[in-house]
A protein has these predicted regions:
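Short loop-to-alpha-helix "cap/lid" segments that border enzyme active sites
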Residues: 1-141
Length: 141
């Protein structure tokens, strides 16, 4: 994923990024993410087939069906089962970020998110191994 942010210094940010992706034949290999809806809208206008993810701390219901967002990345502490279900109902995927504690990882998994974004891959691997064991044991007993 390439996260795009406006800083006020850039000129034609979306066009420049898209040109680079096209030059390196990477349009189908990348996901463009942003907290800025305008950036995602512009990317979809320029290249309708590009994958996009709307990144947010939290979501309002009217944001569940953004035409220019193929998926969502929501701060894990703010995810709810209802939010994930509503986004899935719209045919879109949901990722939780930034899960750097097992508590946040558990919340993201329990909400039914499609993926986890973390800075601590080892902790996530350990967490997932432990969760798989618990689920396996629970199904036996």
């Amino acid at each position: 994923m390439i996260e795009l942010k406006y800083t006020g210094q850039e000129d034609a940010l979306e066009e420049s990024v898209l040109t680079l992706l096209q030059d390196y034949d990477m349009v189908d290999e990348c996901i463009i993410g942003s907290m800025n809806k305008g950036i995602l809208q512009k990317m979809k206008e320029l290249e309708p087939g590009i994958s996009t993810v709307f990144i947010a701390h939290d979501l309002e219901e009217e944001d569940y069906e953004l035409d220019y967002a193929d998926s969502y990345s929501i701060e894990g502490r703010n995810l709810t089962v209802d939010m994930v279900d509503a986004i899935h109902y719209c045919g879109k995927s949901v990722y939780g970020w930034t899960a750097n504690t097992s508590g946040v990882m558990l919340r993201i998994v329990n909400c039914g998110a499609d993926g986890v974004i973390t800075d601590d891959v080892r902790l996530l691997q350990t967490f997932l191994r432990e969760q798989a064991c618990r689920k396996a044991f629970a199904s036996v007993y």
